[in-house]
Amino acid sequence: MTDFSRADGRAVDQMRTVKITRGFTSNPAGSVLVEFGNTRVMCTASVELGVPRFKRDSGEGWLTAEYAMLPAATAERNARESMRGKVKGRTHEISRLIGRSLRAAVDLDELGENTINIDCDVLQADGGTRTASITGAYVALADAIAVLKEQGVVPGNPLKAAVAAVSVGVIDGQVCLDLPYEEDSRADVDMNVIMQGDRFVEIQGTGEHNTFDRDELAVILDFAQKGCQELFAAQKAALEQ
């Protein structure tokens, strides 16, 4: 669709400005502020000696993740889920997605019987909070593992290739990369794609308001691959600073 335009002026295959700031807080072994445009997420990686009961005496480590949004992360304040006494299904789903995605980046055998806890707290939400969380948390994870290696805690080299994630949607028949909230809320098709190198870790896709065919899916995945390659470069640049 040649007359299609995005509210922020980006090309349809263009990412928002991505910033990754390491050492955002001082207590965790790894700490990052990741920004996808106006979406900002604090990602931390904390190390715990030992593993959950189901992993004991296995020789393997474990990685788990928690995701949450601060009350004022959105235009209208939302009460903390802990105060309501119940965590939403969406929060559980995203927490599990982050954990699955980052376990793809770690060799649990090489981690030894140690646990890495990933916490992703959304400071400001403008679409793509789960994809920003995964992308930023990988950098925090890399820093945490570097600390473990320096301390001689881990027996091997647990970190594998980088993992990054991006959203892609179809809006008015046009595939668009990295959706802010304004686009995400009206997308006909909405996908989150997690990649490691040129391989897919997970693909979440829904025809929110319309169906899609194989040709559209191919374009969506091409856009996602382009975005993830740019995110890999941003992660690498951040870790080299």
From Swiss-Prot:
Q: Quick one: a GO biological-process term for this protein?
A: rRNA catabolic process
A Pfam cross-reference name? RNase_PH
Query: Which residues does phosphate bind?
Result: 90, 128-130
What EC number(s) does the entry state? Answer: 2.7.7.56
Domain of life per record: Bacteria
Q: If you read the UniProt record, what top EC class would you report for this enzyme, in one word?
A: transferase
| MF GO annotations | 3'-5'-RNA exonuclease activity; tRNA binding; tRNA nucleotidyltransferase activity
Keyword annotations for this protein, in alphabetical order, are: Nucleotidyltransferase, RNA-binding, rRNA processing, Transferase, tRNA processing, tRNA-binding
Which PROSITE patterns does this UniProt record tie to the protein?
RIBONUCLEASE_PH
Q: Which chemical reaction does it catalyze?
A: tRNA(n+1) + phosphate = tRNA(n) + a ribonucleoside 5'-diphosphate
Q: Which NCBIfam families match?
A: RNasePH
List the PANTHER family hit by this protein, alphabetically: EXOSOME COMPLEX COMPONENT, EXOSOME COMPLEX COMPONENT RRP41
The protein's job, in short, is: Phosphorolytic 3'-5' exoribonuclease that plays an important role in tRNA 3'-end maturation. Removes nucleotide residues following the 3'-CCA terminus of tRNAs; can also add nucleotides to the ends of RNA molecules by using nucleoside diphosphates as substrates, but this may not be physiologically important. Probably plays a role in initiation of 16S rRNA degradation (leading to ribosome degradation) during starvation.
Its name, as the record gives it, is Ribonuclease PH
Taxonomic placement: Bacteria, Bacillati, Actinomycetota, Actinomycetes, Mycobacteriales
What would be the name of the gene that encodes this protein? rph
